[in-house]
Design a protein with these regions (language model features):
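Conserved tyrosine-mediated DNA breakage-rejoining catalytic core shared by Y-recombinases
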Residues: 1-2, 55-91
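Short pre-functional
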Residues: 36-49, 152
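Short, polar N-cap/turn motifs at the start of nucleic acid-interacting alpha helices
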Residues: 59-67, 136-138, 158-177
Length: 200
C-alpha cells in the first residue's frame, strides 16, 4: 500500500549544506568527479533522472532553455539553462557529437541501454563511497538528488503543486510521497511557531 512506499522513501534527501559539502570536495579520481558532478547536474536541473540526463542531446538546449521529455511520463519540461549546468557539460564533452554529456556513445559496440545501465551502476557505486566523505547518514544515489531537490524546495515554502510541475510528476500524490521525508523536527518547529503566536 501507499504507506510502505512512503516509509521506503523516508530517508532519501540531503540538506543544502550537505550538497554544498559534496560540491566542494576535492576529489582524486575522474570517476569520483564525474559521479559528483552528475549528482549536482541532476540537482541543478530540478532532480532530473539519470536516464533523462544520459539521453540528453545537444539539440535539447534551445534559446537559453533545456527542453526535454521525461522518458518515464513523456511530459515535456523546460528548465532555464544556467552557467552551473554549462560548466558540468564543458567538463564531460560528448563522446559522439550528439549527446549533451559524455555518458553514452552512439558509436560504441554496446547498446545505449547497456551503456546506460553500466554507467548508472558505476556512478551509484561511486556515490556510495562519496557518502562517507560528507556529513550525512544515508547513502548517496542519483535518486537522492531528485528527492533532495523536492525536499529543499518545500523547505523554501515552494507550494507542492509547483514542485510537482517542476519535477514532471503526473500527480501531486507522487510529490507528496517524495516529501514524506521532511522530518518530524520541522513539523514540531512549525507547530512551536503557531503555538507561540497564541501563547507569547
Amino acid at each position: 500500500g501507499a504507506f510502505t512506499r512512503t516509509t521506503k522513501t523516508s530517508k532519501r534527501a540531503i540538506s543544502q549544506k550537505a550538497i554544498r559539502q559534496l560540491a566542494q570536495l576535492k576529489l582524486e579520481t575522474y570517476n569520483q568527479q564525474f559521479a559528483r558532478d552528475l549528482f549536482l547536474f541532476s540537482y541543478y536541473t530540478r532532480g532530473m533522472s539519470f536516464v533523462d540526463i544520459a539521453c540528453l542531446e545537444k539539440s535539447n538546449i534551445r534559446n537559453g532553455y533545456l527542453i526535454y521529455k521525461r522518458r518515464k511520463t513523456g511530459q515535456e519540461l523546460r528548465i532555464a539553462w544556467r552557467q552551473s549546468m554549462q560548466d558540468i557539460v564543458d567538463r564531460y564533452p560528448s563522446l559522439d557529437g550528439k549527446h549533451l554529456l559524455g555518458i553514452l556513445d552512439n558509436h560504441a559496440e554496446k547498446s545505449l541501454r547497456q551503456q546506460r545501465h553500466y554507467r548508472q551502476c558505476l556512478i551509484n557505486k561511486t556515490l556510495k563511497k562519496l557518502s562517507k566523505l560528507i556529513d550525512i547518514d544515508i547513502t548517496l544515489t542519483m535518486y537522492v538528488a531528485r528527492h533532495s531537490w523536492a525536499t529543499n524546495a518545500k523547505e523554501k515554502n515552494v507550494p507542492v503543486s509547483v514542485i510537482s510541475d517542476s519535477m514532471g510528476h503526473n500527480s501531486e500524490k507522487t510529490t507528496q510521497i517524495y516529501l514524506k521525508s521532511i522530518n518530524a523536527d520541522q513539523i514540531d518547529q512549525t507547530n512551536d511557531i503557531l503555538i507561540d503566536a497564541i501563547t507569547k
